[in-house]
Amino acid sequence: MFLQPLHRDLGKNQYGAVRESCAVIASLLMNIRSGRDAGQASEILKWIRKREEEMARLLAKLVAVPSENPPGKNYQAVAKVLEKHIRRSGLDFKRLQSKTRTKTSKERPACLLGEHGSGDRTLYFHGHYDVVPAQAAQQFKPQRRKHFLFGRGACDMKGGIVAMLYAILALKELGANLDGKIGLMLVPDEETGGARGSGRLAKEGLLGRAGIGMLSAEPTSGVVWNSNRGAISLRVEVRGKSAHVGLQHRGENAFERMHRVVERLIALKREVESRTTRYATEPEEESNHAVLPVPNRDASLGRHSILMIGGQSGGGTNFNVVPDRCCFTVDRRINPEENLQAEKERLVGVLEDCERDGIPLEWQILQEGESAASSEEEKLGRALARNIAAVRGKAPRFEMCPGLLETRFYAARGIPAYAYGPGLLSVAHGPKEYVDMRRVVECGAIYALTALEFLGK
């Protein structure tokens, strides 16, 4: 059930539901932690709900900046929008500029770090401001249709960033007493592995410092992701020798050689995809704010380990020329029960065998990341679940993210880390990406209430 207090367009009969919902939340929080000012919970809900339009305007500004990755462009522009808002809000803040530029643009990635509260105990709010490339330029012209805001990055995950910013602002403006602080981490480069964002911060010892928990605002379709798959992604190039089709005997066909490589990878794929994980992975969709399983879908299929071949492929120069090169990608997604290094060695071993058999090729690692998992029974996991249930009227499911998450950087340091955000995974990266602003508002309230419970005095 979607609780009405987070709607702006309530009718007269629904205002009773507002008061009732706030009372339920206040009562719940009183039971969670004795001495808690239950009235503060309802004040947080009211404060965030009143700012839906303000939040939508900020999100539209962020979506309008095409911070596409790859290649990693307009990072400076989107960072300036965020920086301006954070500074105007009066939060402690610093900007860490990369010393090196991206390979494909002149951009120098910037990590934005903010905090609210005092002490060493830190709950991290983590988000990434880069987005996947758009299918059309129109995707960077945000459109508002009632409660829905359309545009590249609205779902993944600029909408989630806005929710986190306003969660912190609500706690600040309402004078919430925290035993510790909220650390805000806004990074680039997530869509291509995170090396120049979270990876950089981790290497410099800045990520997760004094951390006791972490929340990420990824588009989770109403569930909580407490685990994620690891990844090893490669680009393989097979070489040949060019010749006119009429003289093909003088050439060496790179496409046919590539076919031999792919055949061996398909054999590995069959074995890999016979394995399953114990973690729940059933795809979820939302309809009228209710989380429902996708109909006619075998949920067990999502538990299989993954080896995808040919996400990108290409080669040759013309139909009448023997191709002198062909390339393709391999994307291996690894379940938490599997070992990244062992699976990497098996995958690379197939390519090395092909080389030994006389097939000239080379490969490049595009991304590499470990799987990770945090128990739903951790204090932060329980607090998050309780506050989702309080705001949405239904306890969330805990599932494994089918892809790679930056929660892994925190989990590797023993910090319980979870992803929960306002977007739908089914529209992320798609041609009609959008986010429901009511869900952005809900998530802002959930983040604030979770922080209040987790860090409250």
Model-derived features with residue positions:
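Acidic/histidine-rich catalytic neighborhood of metal-dependent amide-processing enzymes
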Residues: 157-233, 290-292, 299, 455
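Generic non-transmembrane alpha-helical segments
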Residues: 47, 61, 65, 81, ...
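Acidic/His- and Gly-rich active-site-bordering loop/insert found
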Residues: 32, 36-152, 173-178, 424
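Midchain, well-structured core segments that form catalytic/ion-binding scaffolds
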Residues: 204-355, 369
